[in-house]
């Protein structure tokens, strides 16, 4: 839980203290970190288990890295879902993701929803509507579910 505190100290001081010695930061050292946001980039609205304190946030430059749709498509293809079903599922997830962004909802619709949903659909045990509820709108409040699902064809 105190990993960020240790990292913050190392970034600030330029060295790491170990039991036997101090190790200085390498001249070419670069730290790259990610944070779990609500899927809308560097908004400072993090959903991780431990809040990130201001001093640590201040040590980093924040860049928005959008979901790589080609990677998402490759993840989906790896499941081996029938192409017609895969296309319909991906379209539904992406429409939901757009709805979340446009509505400003604090809901995450990540590529994990695409992958997990495809696996459930491949099993043949669930309808697309059930899978959408289980992977895309899970945990959302009823009014959010309506906004997330607006215009989604299942």
Which residues are covered by each model-predicted region?
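C-terminal regulatory/interaction module of P-loop NTP-utilizing enzymes
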Residues: 1-154
């Amino acid at each position: 839980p105190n990993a960020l505190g240790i990292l913050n100290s190392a970034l600030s001081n330029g060295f790491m203290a170990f039991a036997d010695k101090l190790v200085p930061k390498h001249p070419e050292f670069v730290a790259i970190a990610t944070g779990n946001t609500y899927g809308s980039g560097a908004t400072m609205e993090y959903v991780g288990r431990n809040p990130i304190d201001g001093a640590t946030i201040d040590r980093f430059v924040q860049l928005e890295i959008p979901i790589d749709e080609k990677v998402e498509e490759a993840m989906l293809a790896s499941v081996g879902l029938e192409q017609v079903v895969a296309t319909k599922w991906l379209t539904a997830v992406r429409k939901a993701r757009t709805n979340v962004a446009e509505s400003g909802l604090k809901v995450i619709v990540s590529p994990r929803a695409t992958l997990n949903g495809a696996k459930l659909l491949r099993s043949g045990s669930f309808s697309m509507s059930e899978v959408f509820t289980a992977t895309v709108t899970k945990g959302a409040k009823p009014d959010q579910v309506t906004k997330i699902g607006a215009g989604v064809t299942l």
